[in-house]
Amino acid sequence: MNEQKVLLPRKATVSRQTKETKVEISLDLDGTGESRIQTGIGFFDHMLTLMARHGLFTLEIEAAGDLEVDSHHTVEDVGIVLGQAIAKAAGEKYGIRRYGQIYVPMDEALALVVLDFSGRSYLAFEAELGQGRVGGLDVEMVEEFLRALADNAGITLHIRM
């Protein structure tokens, strides 16, 4: 019986609307790596596109927020909704290994990411990213995105860079 459950589609569509944002995300964990990302924040879109491509899941994100103020609400709410979509699509987690880890060397950076898909959320984030903006993304929002993602997906996430 468990083998059949692995074959069920692991997909989710989740939306969230607040005074500051409107976010809708569709996720297929067994996708192709294709994505359509529109948050209004160029570098954030780029990073989410790479997440889908390298994770081999299909991801659609449509987000509108109060970017004239700053990127905080949009970035955090995308993390919340993506985390909820991951939890919903994973369901009872059939076919998903609980633990995972990877080292990724990219240009001058070396990142270590370790996760536990335990149902208990926690973020340990050790990275000196500095301050400022990259492609419209406030650098300090990276940690807020990851925290919202971990909290809402129910994962323990350790990142060192």
Stretches found by the model and what they are:
Residues N2-M161:
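N-terminal intrinsically disordered, cationic/polar leader segments
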